[in-house]
Amino acid sequence: MIICRTPEEISVQVRRWKAEDKKVGFVPTMGYLHEGHASLFRECLSKADKTVVSIFVNPAQFNDPEDYAKYPINTDGDLKICESGKVDLVFLPEKETIYPEGIPNVVLQVPHLMRNLCAVSRPGHFEGVLLVISRLFHFVKPDFAFFGKKDYQQYLLVKEFCKILAFPVEVIGCETIRSDKGLALSSRNSRLSEDEKEESLLISRALKLGEAQILSGIKDPVVVRDIMKDVLDSSPKIRLDYLEVLNADTLESLEILEGNILLAAAVFIGSVRLIDNRTLRVASV
């Protein structure tokens, strides 16, 4: 497994691969890797000839400095997971490598996909995501890029951003990986106590119940949202950030539940913010 720390090192290696007509897959991460990330590596291995993983905690996407300071880091463990996952190259840059002149005063947006959800509750977050992704894509020049659908809005944004700017990369969304009890895997889960982990299971239960209500024939999104909210409100430890029932393709509100549907939630348990979602399709009548 190759470890690169500069864009120049990556460029040399990727050029070699592409000269051999190899397809390059890319999984951008912020480290503290878990089985969810490993599943992205497997998807990449199934699609591309070479797998590149970046590990970089991007300061530009944190609207809360304390959240950035507390983000867990385990580089040695991450490298072991990458090696066992048959990753070909790991990009381990420093902040000064990605932003040699500091974080630039530039705003990258896809406005029609940034009117709700995390774009509203975490102002500046996705601008920072799009900034770092544009730089990483420029360095790696991947043919494919893999994103977990747990961060569903991020996946849609990056896909649309690449389409708008004509990045020659296919953005592929991968299904959320969960614990045996249903909790969506996240690096932030490590900051939860055992009691808080039990409480956090209400997030996936609420979303699953919402999905079941829709599949049972309920057409009113307000009714479904209220049912899910009752589940989350049953715990005094859960503080709701948002809970939405939206069109899964446009992130617009729905008046009637049909077509591609997204159920999305963000909550705080203590100081830890967790997100989760479910998508489903209901045929139009």
Swiss-Prot record:
Sites where the protein binds ATP: 30-37, 148-151, 177, 185-188
Keywords on record = ATP-binding, Cytoplasm, Ligase, Nucleotide-binding, Pantothenate biosynthesis
What subcellular compartments does it reside in?
A: Cytoplasm
Quick one: where is this thing mainly located? cytoplasm
Can you name one GO molecular function term for this protein? ATP binding
Provide one Gene Ontology cellular component.
cytosol
For this protein, the record's SUPFAM superfamilies field holds: Nucleotidylyl transferase (SSF52374)
Q: Which reaction does it catalyse?
A: (R)-pantoate + beta-alanine + ATP = (R)-pantothenate + AMP + diphosphate + H(+)
> For this chain's UniProt record, which GO biological process terms are given?
pantothenate biosynthetic process
Which pathway is this protein engaged in?
Cofactor biosynthesis; (R)-pantothenate biosynthesis; (R)-pantothenate from (R)-pantoate and beta-alanine: step 1/1
**Which leading EC class covers this enzyme?**
ligase
The catalytic residues are 37
Binding of (R)-pantoate occurs at: 61, 154
EC number per UniProt:
6.3.2.1
Quaternary arrangement and interactors, per the entry? Answer: Homodimer.
Quote additional remarks: The reaction proceeds by a bi uni uni bi ping pong mechanism.
Hey, which family's this protein in? Answer: Belongs to the pantothenate synthetase family.
**What does it do?**
Catalyzes the condensation of pantoate with beta-alanine in an ATP-dependent reaction via a pantoyl-adenylate intermediate.
Q: What is this protein called?
A: Pantothenate synthetase
Provide the taxonomic classification: Bacteria, Pseudomonadati, Spirochaetota, Spirochaetia, Leptospirales
